[in-house]
Regions:
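Active-site helix of classical SDR
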Residues: 122, 158
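Canonical Rossmann dinucleotide-binding motif of NAD(H)/NADP(H)-dependent dehydrogenases/reductases
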Residues: 3-35
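Active-site loop immediately N-terminal to the catalytic Tyr-X3-Lys motif
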Residues: 100, 147-153
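The beta1-alpha1 cofactor-binding region of Rossmann-like NAD(H)/NADP(H)-dependent oxidoreductases
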Residues: 42-43, 61-72, 104
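Conserved NAD(P)H cofactor-binding loop of Rossmann-fold oxidoreductase domains
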Residues: 90-95
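Residue(s) in the substrate-gating loop at a strand-loop-helix junction
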Residues: 142
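Substrate-binding pocket helix/loop in short-chain dehydrogenase/reductase
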Residues: 97-99, 106-108
Length: 168
């Protein structure tokens, strides 16, 4: 298989309802993959499915900070097919302000989605990949995670963790 031939492969893309996640989904579809996009916003997912209009695209409403939702969706998917590829793209930016002004609930929400969500998806999907002796994971990060941003510390901290997760 050449590196851009994903026929007979299934990709799950988090944060796939719009933007970069949807663009990634389109590229995988163009390369022959079956694609399942996850997002917390059902309206975005429906709009994405209408825009793409491809029988190999499906979607599920999933909050990546909720491990039981992820497990349910994975069990549903793996009862029909393997999950070969995971693109952890889900993320939110939140408000820009100095660290000491952040409300702890807002901070926690951002980190739960941007870091815990990535961990949750890896933790839940990797056993399926191991059992099938194939799997590829891409954790989408940000330059803000590398360089930091004094006024977006929750976002920067959450995104810094994605590449720090160990290679599987």
């Amino acid at each position: 298989m050449n590196k851009f031939d994903f026929n007979n492969r299934t990709a799950v893309i988090t944060g796939g309802g719009q933007g970069f996640g949807l663009d990634i989904a389109k590229r995988f579809l163009d390369s022959g993959a079956k694609v399942i996009i996850w997002d917390i916003d059902e309206k975005l997912l429906k709009s994405a499915a209408t825009e793409v209009n491809n029988e190999n695209l499906s979607y599920n409403v999933v909050d990546v900070s909720n491990y039981s939702q992820i497990e349910q969706n994975i069990n549903q998917i793996t009862s029909k097919t393997n999950i070969d590829i995971l693109i952890n793209n889900a993320g939110i930016t939140g408000p820009t302000m100095p660290l000491w002004e952040y409300d702890i609930e807002i901070w926690n929400k951002i980190v739960k989605i941007n870091l815990l969500g990535t961990f949750n998806c890896c933790r839940a999907i990797v056993p399926n990949m191991i059992a099938n002796n194939y799997g590829r994971i891409v954790n989408v990060a940000s330059v803000a995670g590398k360089d930091g941003n004094a006024n977006a510390s929750a976002y920067s901290s959450g995104k810094a963790g994605a590449p720090a997760l160990p290679e599987l």
